[in-house]
Amino acid sequence: MSIIVFPAIDLKGGQVVRLAEGDMDRATVYGDDPADQARRFAEAGAEWLHVVDLDGAFAGRAVNAEAVEAIIKAFPGKVELGGGIRDRAGIDRWLALGVERVIIGTAALQNPDLVREAAKELPGRIVVGVDARDGFVATHGWAEVSTVGITDLADRFADAGVASLLFTDVGRDGLLKGCNVEATVALARHASIPVIASGGVASIADIAALVPHAGDGIEGVITGRALYDGRLDLAEALRVARG
């Protein structure tokens, strides 16, 4: 059994940053050359990248487009992109520019037909972002919390043909508290869609804890701060993830 490790590049003002609990005022800058960071992840063996336009998530439109395009050109593997993609034009634009999969978060809650239509016409290319605070779906760059439960959101797209669900425990994101394996696996077992774990990965132990659940529907795991802070070695994480 194996899972995918997605090293994360979060963009704010063209820089590589990590936030604590999705708070834009608690951003740590890790570099000002996103394309170079993408190359370094590729050299360590990464086949996928998880890229988020943080400014875009709050603005509802692409803000760090130049940096994203530079990453796509620099990274030889596959890129999944989220942040501010809320209409079909945005989806089509990024796929045409070389993004492999597009993550729809806020729009999945507000405009589910967009997700259904795109997933039907673009099989394997649409990921639904399930960002959770205390079991409820958070939207608009995690600044707002809805009354929709995470399993309710998953159920809405059970037969839509989306590639996967990206489950982020917002309360752990960027805090190195450890991945919420229990909640992630519970969602994967409930849903008929593969699940990517995100939020709180602190060490190789978090990767190892998820690998046995590949059979439950865990497709992969996203890691950011642990890599940037040197707590997690990407090459080792990739090796462990291969089972």
UniProtKB/Swiss-Prot annotation:
Q: Enzyme group, top EC level?
A: isomerase
Instruction: Look up the EC number in the record and give it.
Output: 5.3.1.16
Q: Which organism is it from?
A: Rhizorhabdus wittichii (strain DSM 6014 / CCUG 31198 / JCM 15750 / NBRC 105917 / EY 4224 / RW1)
> What pathway does the annotation place this protein in?
Amino-acid biosynthesis; L-histidine biosynthesis; L-histidine from 5-phospho-alpha-D-ribose 1-diphosphate: step 4/9
Subcellular location(s) of the protein = Cytoplasm
Q: What CDD domains does the entry give?
A: HisA
Any one Gene Ontology molecular-function term assigned to this protein's record: 1-(5-phosphoribosyl)-5-[(5-phosphoribosylamino)methylideneamino]imidazole-4-carboxamide isomerase activity
Q: What is the lineage of its organism?
A: Bacteria, Pseudomonadati, Pseudomonadota, Alphaproteobacteria, Sphingomonadales
Residues the record marks as active site:
D10 (proton acceptor), D131 (proton donor)
- The name of this protein is 1-(5-phosphoribosyl)-5-[(5-phosphoribosylamino)methylideneamino] imidazole-4-carboxamide isomerase
Q: Which InterPro entries would you find in this protein's record?
A: Aldolase_TIM, His_biosynth, HisA_bact_arch, Isoase_HisA-like, Isoase_HisA-like_bact, RibuloseP-bd_barrel
- List the Gene3D superfamilies: Aldolase class I (3.20.20.70)
User: Quick one: which gene encodes this?
Assistant: hisA
Catalytic reaction annotation? 1-(5-phospho-beta-D-ribosyl)-5-[(5-phospho-beta-D-ribosylamino)methylideneamino]imidazole-4-carboxamide = 5-[(5-phospho-1-deoxy-D-ribulos-1-ylimino)methylamino]-1-(5-phospho-beta-D-ribosyl)imidazole-4-carboxamide
Q: Which UniProt keywords apply?
A: Amino-acid biosynthesis, Cytoplasm, Histidine biosynthesis, Isomerase
Out of the domains of life, which is the source? Bacteria
Which first-to-last residue range defines the signal peptide?
Answer: none
Q: Name one GO biological process term.
A: L-tryptophan biosynthetic process
- Segments spanning the bilayer are none
The UniProt similarity line reads: Belongs to the HisA/HisF family.
- GO cellular component, as recorded: cytoplasm
Q: Which Pfam families match?
A: His_biosynth (PF00977)
